[in-house]
Amino acid sequence: QITAREWSIPRDEQDKLAYESHQKLASAYDEGFFKDLMTPLAGLEKDNILRPDTTLEKLATLKPVFDRENGTMTAANSTALTDGASCVLLASEEWAKANNMEIKAYLTFSEVAAVDFVDKKEGLLMAPAYAVPRMLEKA
């Protein structure tokens, strides 16, 4: 909500991004993109927040969830509380070879950034906006 307000992102644009995101995710599942990237666990085989049948009209009917008076964030256009369940295992090339692990990728570039959210000088989620361009310059 804070980022949307700070950057003047209107509700309809947030809903449009949410809609497009659901459509792209549904297509990726249909095309088998995640087949070798996801491991089913406890009966869950797909992202449980995917709504492939959603429409912009349905999204527009949802009420704001954080700032009920003036807010624009809804259950559909904000990050779900269950989002973010993932795992990345990193190891040295030497260790991977010694343990007969297949090397799938190399971490070649990284960057660190922080924002001053405590004093409300910058948005909480803005660190990647600083880090990613610097990292891409290195690449």
Task: Name each model-derived stretch.
Residues 1, 46, 76, 118-119:
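A general structural-boundary detector
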Residues 91-139:
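Glycine- and Gly-Pro-enriched alpha-helical subdomains that act as flexible
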Residues 2-11, 28, 130-139:
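Conserved active-site "lid/cap" helical segment
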Residues 8, 12, 119-122:
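Charge-dense, low-complexity intrinsically disordered segments
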Residues 6, 12-98, 103, 108-109:
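N-terminal extracellular/periplasmic Venus flytrap/periplasmic-binding protein-like
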